Amino acid sequence: MDLGSEVKVIRYEDFGAVGDGITDDSAAIRAAHNAANEAGLPVLARKDASYYIGSLESTIVVKTSTDWNGAQLIFDDSTIHWESNLRTTYVFTVNPDVEPTSIPVPEGLTLSKGQTNVGLSFDKPCMIKIESAGDKIYRRYGENANGGVDKNEMILVDEDGNVDPTTPIQYNYSTVTKITVYSTDDAPVSIGNARIKTVVPQPKKIDPDYDNHYCYYGRGIAVRRSNTTLYDIKHSIEGEDMTIEIDRNGDGIIDFWGADRSYGVPYIGFFYFVGCNKATLTDSLLQGHQAYSFWQGATRNEPGNIRNEMGSYDLNATDCINLSLLNLTQYENKETGEVITNRKMYHGVMGSNFCRNVVMDNCYVDRFDSHQGVHNARITNCTLGFGILVIGGGELYVENVHRVGGNAFIHLRMDYNSVFDGDVTVKNCRCGEQMKILIEGRWVKFYNGLDNHVTNNLTVDGLVCDSGEFAFYSIRNLEPTSTTDDVNRLYLPEKIVASNVFAADGVTPLVPEISEQKDAFSATKLIIK
C-alpha cells in the first residue's frame, strides 16, 4: 500500500480490518503495524471497533505509538494446543529499533562486586547483560525445585564502560562468558487505551492428557523496547472460572485452592516486559488469575501422586531496569468486578526475575513478587493482599502500604532460601489484623548460589499493627549455624532501628520483639526511638 506523504496516521481499516468482533482481523492488524513501523507513523484504531484476533501465526511487531481509541481487542487462545509454538507467541511484541547483540568477551575477563568500570568500550551508553556459564545462582527447592540459572545481571554503562551508580555490579565473576548489549535510546512509544479480552484455552477439550503437563502459556503484549509506556488497558479473561479444592496431604484438610485445568491454563504474564530500560505500565486493570496445579507423576492415578501448584500471572518482567508500575488495579473476572484482597486462588497477578530499580506506586493488587531476585524495589501508596514476596538485594523501600491479609508483612521467598542481601525500610505502613510478623523467611542448609543474607539492616518509621502484637522477624527452621565462611553460613540482620510503632488505634505504642528466636538474633542490635 502506497501511504503517500499526506498520511499522518495508520488505521487498521485501511488494511481491511472489519472490527465486528467476529471477523478475524489478524492479517489486517499485522499489515497496518508493518506499514506504521516502516513509515515511522502512529496507529489509531476505530473507537467503536471490536477487533478479533484468532488465527495469529506469529507475533505482531509494534515500533510506533498506538492508540486503540477505546476499542475492544479479543485475543482468542481457546484452540491453541499446549505443544504448539503459538503457546508462547505473544500477540503483540513491542520491539526495539536495534536488536540486542552479543559481543566478543576478552579472554580471562573477570568482574567484581562494586567494580565501577567493566573494562570495555561501547558505541554509546547502553544496557548490558553479564553472564557466567556454569556458575549457578537462585537454585530452587521444594515442589518446583530446579538447579538454578547461570549467574547474570543487567547493568547500565556509558560508552567508556563506566557503570551507572544506580545499577552497581552485584556479584563476583571469576569468568565472564557472555555479554549482550541492549539499546536504551529507542524513541519513546505509548500504547494503550483499549479493552482486551483473552479467551483462554479449554485444554482437555483439545488433549485429554493435558492435566499432567507442566506448561505455561505466553500470550498478550510483550515489551522488549526501552522507553515504552503501556497505558489505560483493561484486561479481562473468559473461560477461567472453575475452582477446585484439593487435599494435597490426604489428611482431610483442604490446603490448596486451584483451578480445574479443563477450564483454563496458567499464563507467564499477559503483560510481559523483558530486556528493556525505562518501561512503564500505568492506569490499567489487571486480571487476577486462578492458581493451577499439575500431576507430578505420569498419571493422576499413580500411587502417591500429588498435585503441585502453578502460579498464573497477568504481569511479568525479566531483565528489566527502571520498571514503573503505576495506578494499577487487580480484579476478578466476575460480573461484580470485585477487587481481590487476599484470596490465595487468585494470588498470581505478578511475577518477575532479574529486575532492578522497580517502582510500584498507587496500586491495589494482590502482590509484589520477585522470583529470581530484584535489586532495589520501591513500593509506595499501595494496598496489597497476598503481600510482598522478595529475594535479591539492594534496598527494599516500602511506604504507605496497607497489607490486608496473611501472617507477615514481607515474605522472603522460602523456595529460594529467603536471601535478601540489602536493607529494608518500612515507613507509615499498616498490617492486617492476622499479621504478627514484619519479615518472614525460612532457612535450610541449602546453598542457592548466593550468600545467605536475611536482610542486613531494617528501619521502621511508622507502623500500625492491627493484631496488637508483633515481632520484626520470624525465620522458620532456624538452628545454630556455622560461624565460618562456608556456604551454609546464615547472615542475620545487623541492626533494627524502629520508631512510631502502634497498636490498631494508632495511639497505643508497641515495642515489638526482634523475634521469638531470641538466641539466634542475639547479635542483632535493636534501637527503639
Language-model features, listed with the residues they occupy:
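Glycine-rich, low-complexity segments
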Residues: 1-9
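Acidic Gly/Asp/Thr-rich repetitive segments characteristic of extracellular carbohydrate-active
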Residues: 12-46, 112-121
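Parallel beta-helix/beta-solenoid
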Residues: 67, 91-113, 119-134, 184-206, ...
